[in-house]
Amino acid sequence: MNSVCLLYTIYPQKENVCSVCKQKKNAPQKKPCPPPCKYCQTSPMATKRKVYITLSESATKIVDLLPSNKGRQSLVLGLIEAYKLIDLCDGTIDIYPAQTKDLTTYHDDEFVKHLMGPRTFLDKNFNKIDKAETDLTNVVIEENDLDEKYGLTFDCYPFPSLDLYVQLTAASSINAARKIVQQVKETNDQIIAVNWYGGRHHCHKSHAAGFCYVNDVVLSINILRKNLGSVFYLDLDLHHGDGVENAFKFSKKVATCSIHRYDIGFYPGTGSLKSSRENTYNIPTEKGLNDSSMLWIIKEIVAPLISNFGPRAIVIQCGCDGLALDTHKEWNMTIKGYRDSIDWILSHFSEIPIMLLGGGGYSHTETAKCWTYLTGSVLGVSDIDTWDILPEHKNLDAYEKDGFRFWTDHNSGPSKMKDHNSVEYLNDIKTHLLSL
């Protein structure tokens, strides 16, 4: 009995040919749809998930130095290790400094040269690893005539070990992408690479921006694109993923989709609906976006876009500065809400390798909880919803205000913030984007 491609029964196509298997609508298939056409009855489905996670204590100490998120990486890694989630992974991904040639696969040569250049005063007065916990508030920043040209001012000022930070942050996502490429060639299982060190989506080709000194996202997508084929990038950060969008705005092999807060004066000020075009999709939201609205967007807008594009890999930036408890207080998302949306994608595109990256998140303990919870969910840990007293570990004191508990009255549900994203507003976005 011949099967037919079922893609059309779920998501309308612009043409009478399946965007994935290239066969005519409802016609008997001459051959099965290749992955990722999960809607074809004869498509091979992944029966198992393999999860790999980036891990490096030395990289953690260096990433802890990022001025906008001092000490955050230690909280994230510490909580993941406290719940023994590393032991449940199929393997870890090493992080060793990226070489200049890796960085210049996207970034401008002179920009990279300036990032890697010596900053004698800063580095002389700060041991690169052993004193990562030192307070840098009173450190006098070296002035350099080129800093302003390359965006190293204001929210991206130079800090000790900047060169090593750039190399390790880039390497975390580069190596995660390489792990995916390697594993895809060796197994039919779904491959998930988790990298909470990465997700610096604002950095541009020739200048730093928005706390982002290197665009590890772009560097990793380029590896996936060159080795596997088309890539779909989904950005869940509160802020528009402008750096990644700009990198691929003329690419036919990379589609970008950013769900973000958009308003006058809200950083970075880009990402309007009207700026969307084929393979560049912006979903600007109003204040108060909650779990149900986010999941609706994922199901009704993002999923059709992914299916129509037919990617060979998916990259998700999981910035969680949209949490109700984040200092921005612009969205009303919960930890479980982020999990529900991300898990829906992982489950419904289970034959596609997926990379999960970090990003924003400025309530550091809640960010650590969110990414630990997401890691546990990806691994299929059954008791994550009932986690209570936090396991003993070296960063436990950071959670004193929470009563040393994972779930509290504050993070187990949304706040009273109103969701200003009406059904009509979201449907207008859906209609516009699916018509491109």
Regions found by a protein language model. Give the residues of each.
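Cys/His-coordinated zinc-binding microdomains
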Residues: 22, 41
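N-terminal low-complexity, Ser/Thr- and acidic-residue-enriched intrinsically disordered segments
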Residues: 46-110
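Cys/His-rich microdomains that often coordinate metals
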Residues: 25-26, 44
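Conserved small/polar residues in nucleotide/adenosyl-binding loops
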Residues: 8-9
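A general "terminal functional-core" signal
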Residues: 37, 43-54, 126-436
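Cys/His/Pro-rich metal-binding microdomains
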Residues: 19, 38
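Cys/His-enriched microdomains
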Residues: 3, 16, 35
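Cationic, histidine-enriched alpha-helical/coil surfaces that engage anionic ligands
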Residues: 93-153
